[in-house]
Each structure stands twice: as C-alpha cells, then as structure tokens.
Amino acid sequence: MTVTAPVSGLLDVDRVAADFPILSRTGRGGNRLVYLDSGATSQKPTAVLDAERGFYTQHNAAVHRGAHLLAEEATDAYEHARQRIADLVGAQPRELVFTKNATEAINLVSYSFSNATAKAQHGRALPDGAERFVLRPGDEIVVTEMEHHANLVPWQEVADKTGAVLRWIGVTEEGRLDLDHPEHGLSVINERTRVVALTHQSNVLGTVTPVGLVAEAAHAVGALVVLDACQSVPHMPVDVEALGADYVAFSGHKML
C-alpha cells in the first residue's frame, strides 16, 4: 500500500476546499467542480455562510434606525465590521463608505465630478471643498489601458458630460504600465490633469502597479487619485495611507 503524506509547507488543497460547501458538488460530466473565477466573485466558506445566516435569524434589523434590541445589535455589528475593515486596510473608520459593490463606489466618485461641474455651470453654490471636483473643457482625466470597465466607463461618461479630455497610460508587452513611454507614459499627467484612475492589481494580468509613483505625480499637479483595489486587497497587505490614493474601492464578495 502506498501512503502519500502532504509535503511540509505546501498548501493542503483538499483541506481548504472542504471549507467551501459549493466545491463538494460535481460539474459537467460528473467531474469534481473546479472554480477559477474568484476575480469576478469568490465562493463563500462555511464560516461566512454561518455568519450571514446567524445575522438574519438572530439580529436582523435596519442599522442606525431604531433603539430596540435588534436595531442596537445590528448597528453594533455594522460598526464593528467598519472598524475591522478599517484596520485591515490602514484607514480610519470614518473614511469608509459602504456601497453595493466597487462599481457603485467608483461611480459615486465619478458622479461627484459630474454633479459639481453641472452646479458650477449653472452658477449654483458649491459645498466647501467641492471646487476641486469641477471639470472644465480642456481639463484631463488619466486612466490606464489595463482598467476594468468599472474604472473606465464612468470616466468616459464624465469626460463626455463635462468636456474633459480622456488620456491614457499605456501597457508594455510584459503587461506592465509603460510609464517611460514618451507619449503614453507618466508624462501624460500634467498641469491640466484633474483625476487619475488606475487599478492596483489587474484583474486580467495580475500585474501590480506602482501606485505610489503615479500618485506622487498626480498630487504634484493637484489631481485626485482613484484606485481600484478589488484584486489586491484580498491577496496582499494593503495600507491605503501608504499607497497615497485619495479614493480606494474594493469588494467584500471577492475577499476569498
């Protein structure tokens, strides 16, 4: 009889898979299900499923909307989660805004530019600090060629509505940002740039971008930096303060 023992230091795939009930089912042809689309959404382990069921069967209520027992418990859980997430990414709890997903989060930021611009064009008063969100014809928005549509289409829409110009940072044959390119490199960030939107880690290539370098160039000309961190936060330590981005979006449903 042959006995195979796991090699020390290697991941025990079967043990990990056992935590995910959906992986116990079979796929086409009766073969064991293999899931490789965690970049879109990750499957949920038993601990997460149990926690969600526990909330809905024991604590479900609208948060910050009541003083009864369930409302207090739900609100406490909600704010505890906010603190845990802030600790995870090196942020302050007051800086976190919960949205349905990262697409909505990025759209929320892009709408800030569209709305502030529309108000300014109609001569309406702007809230304190909103002037930096006003875009004028000839202002520029910089994106990269490796962006997910969620961090591209919103900026195309903003450019179309405001008259701003969309500029691109290119990608090398190796799948990295081509920051040294004379026309499509870091030099596209200039005194007309108002916002720079980029991914931290490509959902297609896995490339990790030099966010700090790009953010430094953007801030030097007064531009805001919007970072898509959906693929990086689940897979590596992320400190949003150290990265230097002004807005960072990531998704809870992709965390495993």
Where are these regions (language model features)?
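Pyridoxal 5′-phosphate
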Residues: 1-256
